[in-house]
Regions:
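Lectin-like carbohydrate-binding module/patch detector with strong preference for beta-trefoil
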Residues: 1-168
Length: 168
């Protein structure tokens, strides 16, 4: 089977390789204290990168867990649910993987995981160069679906497969 999945924005925006949820910093040297971003998906290189790889089983439990760093995604605080932080897992299911392909905050379902509309920033590597955008929780809105609709991807026998959030 597969252990790691990536969560990819359905719309590729300005990078045909697409954008995935990513820990800031480079792969194994990612810095959890710097938090999350949307970054060119590394899967075009033939595997899911460790700083984009979420635990498939924990995701089924609605937990966004990065096993290689032993951290989960949590809202920074309930006063400031718009920003996200990476901390030791609290075993709390903070997110809803919704039918409409959004990732919503369980305690405030009006908030969706959202990629910034601003132009992408260029990263330090990749060919063509990797792109990055900010990631935050914003009010869910159909008009912003290109920035708020996600899909789960994984490799099986060397091929990449897609799965709807709600089917996962």
């Amino acid at each position: 089977e597969f252990d790691l999945v990536e969560i990819k924005l359905i719309n590729n925006l300005d990078d045909k390789r697409g954008f995935c949820i990513d820990i800031k910093g480079h792969k194994s040297r990612a810095k959890i204290e710097r938090g999350l971003q949307a970054h060119t998906c590394y899967s075009y290189q033939g595997e899911i990168a460790i700083d984009q790889g979420l635990d498939a089983d924990r995701l089924k439990q609605k937990e966004l867990f990065f096993p290689n760093f032993n951290v989960c995604v949590h809202p920074s605080s309930y006063n400031n649910p718009l920003s996200l932080t990476l901390i030791k897992c609290k075993n709390t299911k903070e997110f809803i993987l919704d039918e409409d392909n959004t990732i919503r905050l369980k305690n405030n379902t009006n908030l969706c995981l959202t990629v910034a509309k601003e132009e992408s920033r260029k990263g330090g590597g990749g060919s063509p160069v990797h792109l990055m955008r900010n990631l935050s929780m914003q009010i869910c809105n159909n008009k912003h679906s290109v920035y708020q609709n996600w899909v789960i991807r994984y490799f099986k026998k060397g091929k990449i497969f897609k799965e709807k959030l709600s089917k996962f």
